Amino acid sequence: MSDTEDLAALNDRLMAKNHALAEALSRAGKELTKAKSQLAQLAQPPLTFATMVKVDSTRTDEDGIQHASAEVISGTRRMVVPVASNVNAARLTAGATVMLNEKLVLVEQRDADTVGQIRSVKQVLDDGRLIVTDASGNPVLIRRSGALAYAGINQGDRIIIDPSVRLAIEALPAEGDKDLVLEETPDVTFADIGGLDSEIGRIRDAVQLPFQHRALFERYDLKPPKGVLLYGPPGNGKTMIAKAVANALCEGGYDSNGDGAISPAETHVKGVFLSVKGPELLNKYVGESERLIRLIFQRARERAADGNPVVVFIDEMDSLLRTRGSGVSSDVETTIVPQFLSELDGVESLDNVMVIGASNRVDMIDPAVLRPGRLDVKIRVGRPKTNQAIAIVDHYLTDDLPLEDGVDAHALSAVLVHDIYGTSERRHLCDVQEENGQWHALFLADVVSGAMLKNIVDRAKTRAVKESIETGLDVALTVPLLAAAVEDEYRETRDSMADVDPEQWSRINGMDPIRRIRTAE
């Protein structure tokens, strides 16, 4: 190979290496640029969140450049900071979230924060400022944000405040009636309740008559009762009666203007049923339970303003309105009871509003609540007698169920009830010692309730269903099947008596105080 050819080959190799080096250099340059960009991004100082209070000053120079400053709150610091020229100061609103750079210059505005502490409005001042209460009940005076400048805010409303506790930044929707008002009308009617004809008659007289015959009540200068108390041992229909009242109220047809006649328009006037569970109103924060009571009666007054009858039903009333100074709970009742009483018969009228309470322990309710003029009508819903028990069982043992040929459902009900109410040894639960030291026998009939009667029938039906599954045929409800259900209920009740506290058990079940219980073998 000649020298010329050698030089040409060397030149080709060098050119190839040169291209490779150039490509490597180009890649290295790109990687270096990328690294510098990442380094610059990582070296960028952080921005600080702050809450906008107001624009402090603003002007525009001869070159059209904006010079503005704004008052902001960052954490606990209240500052006046410059506003960057590219941020329109006219669009800065109180309560909005703004960003500050490392030199504390306002460089960006964002939407107001949607989270924060929730406070209740205690008072709205004439100038629009708000007095709110914190978790301990202490009042704090705050201003409104721009978004709430013209918003209608009332006492008791809930708002979100900024971290500095200086600005109200958002109003929350009012706690809806869905927590207090039955969204659906209960399907229980008075016809569905057996064995309580006397009690039903009394509560219908107290609740329905004043609204259906308003003119007659005015003619006789008779004021409707403010409240009704349903009390007695558990499981005997107090809540069912309240549901039936709700159903009857929602049927409509009330004399709303007191002219003594129900016009076609008034047939559409329907009552409102506010259902409240007593324990739900108890709150560990000072003043919160009282606020909820005020809210309930405020809702009731609003609904009753158009002449609609309103019933406020408070279940487990003894848990909410306990005797003050009784020492059986915290001191929360010392403020809850006066608040309830002030709402019931205070300065503000409660026209068209009636309170119905239900309790197993009437002895624990403050006497001031029970006096005439407050809960005027007191209805004891006691344990059913034999005839009442048969009427109750008739609602669950009907002729459309699988029965033996020639067997009447009412006759089965009578047999079932007579078995339950027997006083032989086979229905003996235990012996109890009263406070005077005397012992006497306690039978299943002494603790029977409407709920227990339904449970016994359900036991028999469950046995029939299981036997029907095994045999593939409809098994009739027979006397032996019902007797077995009674026996199961008796055994469970007898066994549970060994673990109860005698005094508490006797009070809850509406009996005379019991010192000791001696269970049957």
Swiss-Prot record:
Residues 4-44 form a coiled coil. GO terms for molecular function: ATP binding; ATP hydrolysis activity. The keyword Acetylation does not apply. InterPro entries: AAA+_ATPase, AAA_ATPase_domain, ATPase_AAA_core, ATPase_AAA_CS, NA-bd_OB-fold, P-loop_NTPase, Prot_ATP_ID_OB_2nd, Prot_ATP_ID_OB_N. Pfam families: AAA, Prot_ATP_ID_OB_C, Prot_ATP_ID_OB_N. One of its GO terms (cellular component) is proteasome complex. One of its GO terms (biological process) is proteasomal protein catabolic process. Keywords: ATP-binding, Coiled coil, Nucleotide-binding. ATP binds at residues 235-240. Signal peptide: none annotated. Homohexamer. Assembles into a hexameric ring structure. Belongs to the AAA ATPase family. This is AAA ATPase forming ring-shaped complexes. The gene is arc.
